[in-house]
């Protein structure tokens, strides 16, 4: 599982649209869709109900979206802490 895939899921959830989320993430819509589908296949769940418009999270997606946000937040905190250590050690 890649951090980027979680960022894609979060973007789709926020924008309720795969095309807009892809634009925000600077990737093609097909790349974003394939990455999310890959994560769904890996875990055997569906994050989004693609039949609804605007796109909505499934119950499984609802149960996991806050955890995805937490992972992304912690990764950003880790990156900042590591950068600060580098600056302080120079």
Question: Where do the language-model regions lie?
Answer:
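Helix-turn-helix DNA-binding elements, focusing on the entry/boundary residues of the two helices
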Residues: 17-18, 36, 50
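Interdomain hinge and pocket-entrance segments immediately C-terminal to HTH DNA-binding domains
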Residues: 83-90
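A short LG(V/I)-centered, amphipathic sequence patch enriched
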Residues: 40-57, 79
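The N-cap/first-turn positions of alpha helices
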Residues: 2-5, 29, 61, 68
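A short, exposed helix-loop element centered on a Lys and neighboring polar residues
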Residues: 76-83
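Short helix-boundary/capping micro-motifs
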Residues: 10-28
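Alpha-helical residues within the helix-turn-helix
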Residues: 23-24, 41, 62
């Amino acid at each position: 599982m890649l951090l980027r895939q979680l960022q894609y899921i979060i973007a789709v959830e926020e924008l309720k649209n795969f095309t807009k989320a892809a634009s925000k993430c600077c990737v093609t819509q097909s790349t974003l869709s394939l990455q999310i589908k890959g994560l769904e296949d890996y875990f055997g769940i569906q994050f989004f109900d693609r039949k609804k418009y605007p796109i909505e999270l499934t119950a499984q997606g609802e149960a996991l979206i806050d955890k995805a946000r937490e992972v992304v937040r912690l990764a950003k905190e880790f990156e900042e802490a590591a950068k600060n250590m580098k600056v302080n050690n120079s």
